[in-house]
Amino acid sequence: SSSSRGLGDVYKRQSKFSLTNKSTDIEVHPLKLTELRDKQLYWRDEDKLGSTEFTFSRFLVPELNNFKGWALFCDCDLLFMEDVNNLFALTDDQYALMCVKHDYNPKEGTKMDGKQQTIYPRKNWSSVVLWNCGHESNKKINRELVNNPDTTGKYLHRFSWLEDHEIGSIPHHWNWLAGWYEEPKDGTPKAIHYTEGGPWFENYRFCEYHQLWKDTVSYTHLTLPTT
């Protein structure tokens, strides 16, 4: 619906603002399926289980970066509290990618505005990924593999084309799962991830950290559409 598209636009722009407001020397490029399809980079059928349009397209990041340098992928429901350059400072060339290795087992049967919650090992590891785009092992993760209908979401989201030693760790503060990690027991967040749903959904209007998100929306003069 136009309302859901409007909500999507708001939280994507808000997430981008939280990145660029604290980091002036970065480029942010949304993964838009229409653009990727136009460029013959993405041609998979719609994923019925996918809760976002980048369920599969996130794995095109190494190719989109011409298999060179480091790039960050993050879900669009994150609120960055700190300069993302401090995250890039953690990169280590021995790894093909780096992520928060959550021990996360959600209980909810649905998420995000009614989408089914799919349970699998390494849940949410792929929601914030530092990609070493030039790593030899990431040459396997190209448009042909990503678009192959036999390539499952579980294969990709578990990083199954990599050996375990090729996956580096970053501190959980950079992918702080709201409602899972707790302050002060687990420290303090550097990037808040509203993984179960955020204040842009009616049934999550007052979720944990809801006011931080609303304050950012107000500051950037974004308007929540009526539902």
What are these regions (language model features)?
Residues 1-8, 20-22, 215:
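Short, intrinsically disordered, charge-balanced linker/junction segments flanking boundaries
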Residues 6-14, 220-226:
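Conserved small/polar residues in nucleotide/adenosyl-binding loops
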Residues 12-26, 69:
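N-terminal G-site helix/loop of the GST-like fold
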Residues 29-61:
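Active-site-proximal specificity loops/subdomain of glycosyltransferases
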Residues 57-106, 130:
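GT-A fold catalytic core of metal-dependent nucleotide-sugar glycosyltransferases
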Residues 92-153:
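Conserved catalytic core of nucleotide-sugar-dependent glycosyltransferases
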